[in-house]
């Protein structure tokens, strides 16, 4: 599930970039408003769940395994949580403008903000995919994977 979410994050980062260009050349029409709303929903819901999956479910299990295997993961895990915090802060600034675009009240996105967010996501995903996920794939057992999957599904359950 985490790898699939990473791919969707990449797709939505690209959509955000395309929306910025679209607004510059076409303007804020219904298509831009709809795209803006879709991007907001994805980052507000799916990414929030994804961060919770990692921070509340995956990382605690990996830290415990790391201690037993004598593999120091504290620094990598701390960096990941710090990255998530910075991503959330950067997203907040873009979100306010996207919200205005979704209602036709705003016509422009800051390409530097988009670029910063996309680069930060790219760097974070690369770190996860080259350091954290290989460790998880090597050390997690079927039962642990099933428990993590169940927690992820429960997090997404409609309430």
Briefly describe each language-model feature range.
Residues 1-159:
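Small-residue-biased structural context
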């Amino acid at each position: 599930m985490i790898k699939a979410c990473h791919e969707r994050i990449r797709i939505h980062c690209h959509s955000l970039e395309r929306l910025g260009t679209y607004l510059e050349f076409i303007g804020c029409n219904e298509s831009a408003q709809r795209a803006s709303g879709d991007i907001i929903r994805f980052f507000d819901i799916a990414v929030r769940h994804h961060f919770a999956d990692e921070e509340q479910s995956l990382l605690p299990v990996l830290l415990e395994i790391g201690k037993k295997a004598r593999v120091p993961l504290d620094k990598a895990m701390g960096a990941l949580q710090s990255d998530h915090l910075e991503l959330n802060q950067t997203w907040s600034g873009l979100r306010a403008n996207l919200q205005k675009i979704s209602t036709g009240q705003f016509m422009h996105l800051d390409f530097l903000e988009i670029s910063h967010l996309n680069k930060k996501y790219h760097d974070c995903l690369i770190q996860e995919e080259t350091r954290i996920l290989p460790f998880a794939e090597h050390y997690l057992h079927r039962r642990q994977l099933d428990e993590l999957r169940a927690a992820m599904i429960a997090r997404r359950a409609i309430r």
